[in-house]
Amino acid sequence: MNRLTKKLKELKAENKKALVAYLVAGDPDIESTLSLMKLFIESGVDIIEIGVPFTDPIAEGPIIQKAHDRALQKNVSLSLIFNMIKDFRIEDNETPIVLMGYLNTFISHKDLIKNNEENSIDSILVVDIPGEVNLADYGLESSNVNTISLISPTTKENRIKSIAQNSSGFVYYVTLRGVTGSSNLNIDEISKNIEKIKKYASVPTLAGFGIKSPEDAKLLAKCSDGVIIGSSIVKMIEESSDSREFDRIGQYITEIKQAISWID
């Protein structure tokens, strides 16, 4: 069974919420990314989401855009990312890994996705195509890689149905109107929209974008199957890029994990 599917089933059976942590591969360098992935697991992360650097990351806010720029300056490619993941798999063959990126990158390296040597990755999220589009149409299908689609607060119900049914990993509900890293969570709207998604989805619905504090995470975990933390982690990585001291990130993740583990 695909690692992501297995992990989400286990969490559901244990009545637990999933914690997904995001970082951009190669920011500040590929060695630090590998170290951070290990730190994520030690701090309680269930699933790792790796951003694939791209020249025009239109779905991202300024914090993550800058991380893409820094990684590109280090010539980080999808091939290099796969090699890094293979190194990670030497020590950890259990943690699900999701690649989040843009269509042109994945098409340019479609053999990496299709072959997925040693089952390195578990899912891909292509952010710049409609969620109801089948990745097989782009030659990106793989028997052991499932797909994740985005649904936003402005997505109409007829599209919610088709997008939810097209997702084989989980549905990624974007909690905010705009790009990643925005603020001000409308919990009532989020709760209603996730309820709507769950009518159609056979896979879990996780919430992301705009989660800054353990309190934010706890609120979202009450109405979703898990939370995705991105911009706040990427910001801390940037602030620690000179020293390469990432302990503060581990502490932050631990606090998020504790918050979503105690849902009233």
What is the role of each PLM region?
Residues 1-94, 165, 247-254:
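Conserved N-terminal beta1-alpha1 strand-loop-helix module at the mouth
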Residues 1-11, 55-64, 73-86, 106-111, ...:
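Active-site-adjacent beta->alpha loops and helix N-cap segments on the catalytic face
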Residues 14-19, 44-46, 92-97, 120-122, ...:
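Short, well-ordered coil/turn segments that N-cap beta-strands
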Residues 19-23, 48-50, 97-101, 124-126, ...:
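Hydrophobic faces of well-ordered beta-strands that scaffold small-molecule active sites
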Residues 30-41, 155-166, 207, 211-227:
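Catalytic cores of alpha/beta
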Residues 45-56, 122-134, 171-181, 223-242:
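Glycine-rich phosphate-binding active-site loops on the catalytic face of alpha/beta enzymes
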Residues 144-181:
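Histidine/lysine/aspartate-rich catalytic loop segments that bind and position anionic ligands
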Residues 195-203, 212-218, 222-264:
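Alpha/beta catalytic cores of nucleotide-metabolism and tRNA/nucleoside-modifying enzymes
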